[in-house]
């Protein structure tokens, strides 16, 4: 029986370990949303996301539609993971030193600025102009999924460069949401949020490691920001940035305590039966506690949340937001609409041009150097993959447009650009690797 269960589990475990699997699940959720939106069950599909759900009590609770709970609540978990990744990268990653950080920062800045300018050039007037932030984003799950298909053909440094670029890109998108896509701000609630944030920072500086402390105050921060007019997703990033990055035990303490309890475990010896002797169990539990304390809260949470976000949060978001009614009679009109063109051209042209040009400038003036084993053709290919906006672009489009026609046109532009960018980026990087091989 155990063999049969293992036999059934193995294919799933292998799939979830593969780097491209997150993009595959996200693509599946998107296709399902499009199929449902254009099926006989279209009405039920859209109605389902408008069901109201109350969390709390009669006089102390939050009532939102299911769609809003996903965009404001569930996506806060995604942004929390973004905050954790940002902190790790700035402390001990590709963004830890000035010279290392300059290339992805410059590339991300160009990859945000040029698409926004292209969109604004095509849509200079309000209300269409409000969508300028949509083509600024990169979907890291899809982009890394395409790179994973080229495993063995591209350098590891190129994958690290794309990851760092996408993380900086996410930070830029968060700032854009906070500054330009939040509602009317309630100053009193923002002051309460600031006090909560300062308490969280103080807890971090004082060495508080309890995740209950950060979880409780973090939830309060999310609720206050939700009520303040500032988009609640910002709370996720802020909480992620204050999670402790240093473990309770240093390397020497971990080694000493591990050796101590391993020696005790060996002394007790093996006991008959499936259950451990009380002292032996105590040694095992102590080892478990030591291993827990040897890993920082930041790394542990990032590790534990990664799969839940990639295979749960983001696909659910896509399922709720990617539903687009495609009518053949209006398709030509929709494709040629300025919002559709602005989003599509911003992602398809603006992203690669901005990333390539700003990378070239930063290398040319001596601020940084290209990653080892990377050519300018590789950077151009990464720039094209940056045009896969998807998750964050869909998120911003929901904030930019209340008008359903404009929102749908923005989604159409995102879909067109993301598909073409994925195919073109794969082709360019494949040819670049083939040239190196020869």
Swiss-Prot record:
Keywords annotated in UniProt: Antiport, Cell inner membrane, Cell membrane, Ion transport, Membrane, Sodium, Sodium transport, Transmembrane, Transmembrane helix, Transport
Q: Where are the membrane-spanning stretches? A: 21-41, 66-86, 102-122, 130-150, 160-180, 183-203, 206-226, 308-328, 341-361, 376-396, 410-430
What Gene Ontology terms describe where this protein resides (cellular component)?
A: plasma membrane
Q: Look up the record and give one Gene Ontology term from the biological process aspect.
A: regulation of pH
Q: Name one GO molecular function term.
A: sodium:proton antiporter activity
Q: How does it sit in the membrane?
A: Multi-pass membrane protein
Q: Where in the cell is it found?
A: Cell inner membrane
Q: Which reaction does it catalyse?
A: Na(+)(in) + 2 H(+)(out) = Na(+)(out) + 2 H(+)(in)
NCBIfam families recorded: NhaA (TIGR00773)
Q: Which family does it belong to?
A: Belongs to the NhaA Na(+)/H(+) (TC 2.A.33) antiporter family.
Protein task: Na(+)/H(+) antiporter that extrudes sodium in exchange for external protons.
PANTHER family in the cross-refs = NA(+)_H(+) ANTIPORTER NHAA, SODIUM ION/PROTON ANTIPORTER NHAA-RELATED
**Protein name in UniProt:** Na(+)/H(+) antiporter NhaA 2
Q: Which organism is it from?
A: Syntrophotalea carbinolica (strain DSM 2380 / NBRC 103641 / GraBd1)
